[in-house]
Each structure stands twice: as C-alpha cells, then as structure tokens.
C-alpha cells in the first residue's frame, strides 16, 4: 500500500508534463543539430569554411543570448513565459531552415532564432528545479530523471534525423521538428 501511495505521488500531472516536454524538446533539438553541417553543405551549398563560421557564430550568439536571458529570468522570475517564447522561436527557427536555403538569412535570422530557442532547455530545467523544491520532491532524483529523458531523446533523435533527411528531405525533417516544438508548447 505504501508503494502505491508513493508511486501516485511520483506520477502526478506536473511531473509527467516536465518529463514529456523535456523528451519532446530533446527529440526536436536532436533532429536539427546532428544534420546541420550536412544541410549547410548539401542544401545551402556552403563550403567548409562557411559551415565552420556558421557553427562559430551560432555558438557565440548562443552563449551571449543564453546568459542575457538567464539573468533576465533570474531577476524577473517568469520562466514559463520565457520557455513558451523560446519554444515559439524554435518553431520559427525550424520553419526557417525548412523553407530557406539562403546562407546569409540562415546565419543572421537563423542564428538569432536558434540562440533564443536553445535557452528553452536550461530554463525548463530551472523551472523543474523550482517545482521540485516547492513540492517537496527529491530534487536530485527529479532532475536526474529529466536528464535521462533528454539523453533518451538524443539516442532516438539523431538516427531519426538522418533517416528523415536522407529519405524524405530536410524540409520534412525540419517541419517535423517544428511540429514537435508546437506540441511542446501545448
């Protein structure tokens, strides 16, 4: 009987929502990241230097935007709205990559959208931590299970990404990623 009571306490709706959203956002991200260099070289026609430059600009912008949004989130404290905003940016980013093949557009608008979108996952983990602290859950276990969801997503996502990209095209792959982010918004 005690086992049933503790199991029911562990499997509440909020807990399940955190796990599902972490998994889905992880899959959507894992669809895009591993195939990016292939997309840039094959679809956009970028030479190796430009692919490397894209990754460099993307990393620097991601760090700067993430730091800025983290400071803003810590001071204002509304992580839910920020996560929703970041997921909306992720949808826009995936659709941009699905239907645009112009390098300058991708390295400007795409990098900006990706930088904003990539902030969603750390904010989700911060919100989960706040939830675990306030609900008397075991914080370490809760965080570990969420990280396991993200790891599982990264086991499933890359092979799925290459299967979709090589068999159905990058437009389909990025559109599916956008769809997964839309579902994560709900």
What is each model feature region?
Residues 172-186:
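Symmetry-related core transmembrane helices of the 12-TM Major Facilitator Superfamily/SLC fold
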Residues 81-96, 175-178:
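Structural signature of the two symmetry-related core transmembrane helices
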Residues 111-148:
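Cytoplasmic helix-loop-helix junction between adjacent transmembrane helices
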Residues 3-59:
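Helix-loop boundary and gating motifs at the non-cytosolic
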Residues 64-78, 165:
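Helix-to-loop junctions at the C-terminal end of transmembrane segments
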Residues 59-67, 154-155:
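Residue-level signature of mid-helix packing/kink "hotspots" within the transmembrane helices
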Residues 23, 93, 103-121:
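Hydrophobic core of transmembrane alpha-helices in multi-pass small-molecule transporters
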Residues 156-172:
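Transmembrane alpha-helix termini and helix-breaking/packing motifs in multi-pass membrane transporters
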């Amino acid at each position: 009987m005690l086992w049933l009571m503790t199991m029911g306490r562990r499997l509440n709706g909020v807990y399940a929502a955190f796990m599902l959203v972490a998994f889905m956002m992880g899959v959507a991200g894992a669809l895009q990241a591993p195939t990016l260099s292939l997309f840039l070289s094959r679809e956009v026609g970028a030479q190796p230097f430009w692919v490397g430059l894209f990754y460099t600009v993307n990393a620097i912008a991601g760090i700067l935007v993430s730091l800025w949004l983290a400071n803003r989130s810590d001071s204002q404290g509304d992580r839910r709205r920020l996560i929703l905003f970041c997921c909306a940016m992720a949808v826009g980013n995936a659709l941009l990559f699905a239907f645009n093949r112009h390098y300058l557009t991708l390295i400007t608008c795409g990098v900006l959208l990706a930088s904003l979108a990539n902030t969603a996952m750390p904010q989700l983990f911060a919100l989960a931590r706040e939830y675990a602290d306030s609900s008397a859950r075991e914080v370490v276990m809760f965080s570990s299970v969420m990280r396991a969801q993200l790891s599982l997503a990264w086991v499933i996502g890359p092979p799925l990404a290459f299967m979709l990209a090589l068999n159905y095209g990058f437009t389909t792959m990025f559109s599916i990623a956008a769809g997964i982010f839309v579902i994560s918004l709900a």
